[in-house]
């Protein structure tokens, strides 16, 4: 499936309307977003100035073209981790300096969130973070080759708490299969949620994907950084309501 007119009036803009959704040729469950539209937001003047200057270097928009990660980061052979739904990038910017040997790609729909992360990256002189604006499932499916990623992170995804909206949750059998395909053997999937019902939902799915071996939490021998370093905005709101943070780790089975 190709994306139609990809022209943009401004850097990093997405087409209006509903997000693009791939049709997968299997019987697994994938998020069906229905009436959800792209979130649009206004940047401050300073954010817009930085965006115009830095986006061509640091950012991309969802497209039907595989990313050449080595070329984008300017180095060969480094590990690559994709964070789905990076929000304002609080965890991203805190973790990246501690894993300087790893390429971090933050995927987010909300432009002001990416702009805030960009500000943290530029001010902190963090050189191992890049950004893609788009839906996480589509970005993974269209822009990363199978078996190319060392890690995938999904921190505090939208819980879609109403029963009729559960089908929109990103943690389902289909995405778990997609994550497994994109990970290298030995690659790690890390998920965190503070929503009790979503945690129960995930608990029912931890062994649904045969290519992912569930490691539980914590996993002391995990080959990647799992300490998120800071409390994100959404995590903080959950803690204020006495929510329990549930975390999950899987490793793609070795060949």
Curated annotation (Swiss-Prot):
<dbReference type="GO" id="GO:0008176">
    <property type="term" value="F:tRNA (guanine(46)-N7)-methyltransferase activity"/>
</dbReference>
<keyword id="KW-0949">S-adenosyl-L-methionine</keyword>
<feature type="region of interest" description="Interaction with RNA">
    <location>
        <begin position="164"/>
        <end position="169"/>
    </location>
</feature>
<protein>
    <recommendedName>
        <fullName>tRNA (guanine-N(7)-)-methyltransferase</fullName>
        <ecNumber>2.1.1.33</ecNumber>
    </recommendedName>
</protein>
<feature type="binding site">
    <location>
        <position position="83"/>
    </location>
    <ligand>
        <name>S-adenosyl-L-methionine</name>
    </ligand>
</feature>
<comment type="pathway">
    <text>tRNA modification; N(7)-methylguanine-tRNA biosynthesis.</text>
</comment>
<dbReference type="GO" id="GO:0043527">
    <property type="term" value="C:tRNA methyltransferase complex"/>
</dbReference>
<dbReference type="InterPro" id="IPR003358">
    <property type="entry name" value="tRNA_(Gua-N-7)_MeTrfase_Trmb"/>
</dbReference>
<feature type="binding site">
    <location>
        <position position="158"/>
    </location>
    <ligand>
        <name>S-adenosyl-L-methionine</name>
    </ligand>
</feature>
<comment type="function">
    <text>Catalyzes the formation of N(7)-methylguanine at position 46 (m7G46) in tRNA.</text>
</comment>
<keyword id="KW-0819">tRNA processing</keyword>
<feature type="binding site">
    <location>
        <begin position="232"/>
        <end position="235"/>
    </location>
    <ligand>
        <name>substrate</name>
    </ligand>
</feature>
<feature type="binding site">
    <location>
        <position position="108"/>
    </location>
    <ligand>
        <name>S-adenosyl-L-methionine</name>
    </ligand>
</feature>
<keyword id="KW-0489">Methyltransferase</keyword>
<feature type="binding site">
    <location>
        <position position="162"/>
    </location>
    <ligand>
        <name>substrate</name>
    </ligand>
</feature>
<dbReference type="Pfam" id="PF02390">
    <property type="entry name" value="Methyltransf_4"/>
</dbReference>
<feature type="compositionally biased region" description="Basic and acidic residues">
    <location>
        <begin position="1"/>
        <end position="11"/>
    </location>
</feature>
<feature type="region of interest" description="Disordered">
    <location>
        <begin position="1"/>
        <end position="25"/>
    </location>
</feature>
<dbReference type="InterPro" id="IPR055361">
    <property type="entry name" value="tRNA_methyltr_TrmB_bact"/>
</dbReference>
<dbReference type="InterPro" id="IPR029063">
    <property type="entry name" value="SAM-dependent_MTases_sf"/>
</dbReference>
<feature type="binding site">
    <location>
        <position position="135"/>
    </location>
    <ligand>
        <name>S-adenosyl-L-methionine</name>
    </ligand>
</feature>
<comment type="similarity">
    <text>Belongs to the class I-like SAM-binding methyltransferase superfamily. TrmB family.</text>
</comment>
<feature type="active site">
    <location>
        <position position="158"/>
    </location>
</feature>
<keyword id="KW-0808">Transferase</keyword>
<feature type="binding site">
    <location>
        <position position="194"/>
    </location>
    <ligand>
        <name>substrate</name>
    </ligand>
</feature>
């Amino acid at each position: 499936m190709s994306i139609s007119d990809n022209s943009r009036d401004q850097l990093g803009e997405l087409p209006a309307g509903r997000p693009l959704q791939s049709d997968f040729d299997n019987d697994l469950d994938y998020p069906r977003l229905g009436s959800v539209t792209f979130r649009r937001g206004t940047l401050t003047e300073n954010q817009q100035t930085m965006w115009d200057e830095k986006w061509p270097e640091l950012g991309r928009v969802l497209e039907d073209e595989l990313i050449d990660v080595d070329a984008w980061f300017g180095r060969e052979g480094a590990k690559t981790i994709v964070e789905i739904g990076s929000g304002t990038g609080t965890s991203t910017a805190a973790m990246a300096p501690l894993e300087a040997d790893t390429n971090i790609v933050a995927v987010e729909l909300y432009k002001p969130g990416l702009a805030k992360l960009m500000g943290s990256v530029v001010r902190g002189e963090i050189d191992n973070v890049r950004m893609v604006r788009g839906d996480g499932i589509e970005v993974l499916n269209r822009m990363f080759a199978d078996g190319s990623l060392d890690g995938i992170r999904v921190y505090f995804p939208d819980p879609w708490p109403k029963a009729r909206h559960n089908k929109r949750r990103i943690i389902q059998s289909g995405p778990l299969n997609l994550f497994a395909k994109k990970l290298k053997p030995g690659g790690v999937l890390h998920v965190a949620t503070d929503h009790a019902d979503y945690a129960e939902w995930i608990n029912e799915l931890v062994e649904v994907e045969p290519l992912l071996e569930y490691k539980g939490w914590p996993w002391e021998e995990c080959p990647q950084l799992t300490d998120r370093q800071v409390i994100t905005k959404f995590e903080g709101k959950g803690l204020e309501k006495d929510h329990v943070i549930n975390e999950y780790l899987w490793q793609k089975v070795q060949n």
